[in-house]
Amino acid sequence: MSTIQLEAQSRTDMGKGASRRLRRLENKVPAVIYGGSKKPMAIHFSHNKVIKALETESIYSSVFDITVDGKVEHVILKALQRHPYKPIVLHMDLQRVSSKDILVKLVPVHFINEEQSPGIKAGGIVQHTMTQVEIRCQAKDLPEFIEVDMSKVGMDDVVHLSDLKLPKGVQLTVDVADGSHDAPVVSIHAAKVSSTELEETPEVPASAVPTTDQGESAE
């Protein structure tokens, strides 16, 4: 579970007009929380605190706590609506979860120890084919990210989905057993030489090479 904690207040004013007033006059983010055995609830957050929380990567893929009128709820972020060009959050959807709920989430992939990779030391270029993977697990087992250790990845090596070391209780949503869905995650290949670098240096004609005048010696 993420260490993120946000405080919210319930609201009774509904509709687009009420949401606009919250955003413009009170600098609040309207939101809704739903799921579990409780009824959906309209709430709002401090916009500044939401912006700060969104700087933390784990809020997009982890279970975190919100406090609504003094009561703690365990939630995941289901949807986030942003202004098309202003740094403003327009609305948030949050889903209540319990520890045993089965979740399907996209989580980020972190590549560690790249500086120790034999392939990189040999001048290879890293190609990150995936930066996140979809997993299935109970809420209590939901990781903030999946690590890929690059310390032993050599030149022309490819790390596939089947090579990922998943935490206990976590599964990929795709079946990689038969290989047809075993997509590459990261690879290292030799740097490509551009065509201009491959062009041969043009030959210099003999007539362009200066010669030394050794004239006849006087007797």
Curated annotation (Swiss-Prot):
Is Acetylation given among the entry's keywords?
Answer: no
Q: Which SUPFAM superfamilies match?
A: Ribosomal protein L25-like (SSF50715)
Instruction: List every stretch annotated Disordered.
Output: 194-219
GO BP, one annotated term: translation
Q: Which cysteines are joined by disulfide bonds?
A: none
Supply one GO CC term from the record.
Answer: cytosolic large ribosomal subunit
| One MF annotation (Gene Ontology) recorded for this entry | structural constituent of ribosome
Q: Which InterPro entries match?
A: Rbsml_bL25/Gln-tRNA_synth_N, Ribosomal_bL25/Gln-tRNA_synth, Ribosomal_bL25_b-dom, Ribosomal_bL25_C, Ribosomal_bL25_long, Ribosomal_L25_dom, Ribosomal_uL5_bac-type
Q: Keywords, A to Z?
A: Ribonucleoprotein, Ribosomal protein, RNA-binding, rRNA-binding
Signal peptide as annotated in the record: none
Q: Report biased composition (Polar residues) as residue ranges.
A: 209-219
Quaternary assembly: Part of the 50S ribosomal subunit; part of the 5S rRNA/L5/L18/L25 subcomplex. Contacts the 5S rRNA. Binds to the 5S rRNA independently of L5 and L18.
Family recorded in the similarity comment: Belongs to the bacterial ribosomal protein bL25 family. CTC subfamily.
User: What does the UniProt function comment say about this protein?
Assistant: This is one of the proteins that binds to the 5S RNA in the ribosome where it forms part of the central protuberance.
How is this protein named in the record?
Answer: Large ribosomal subunit protein bL25
Q: Which organism is it from?
A: Legionella pneumophila subsp. pneumophila (strain Philadelphia 1 / ATCC 33152 / DSM 7513)
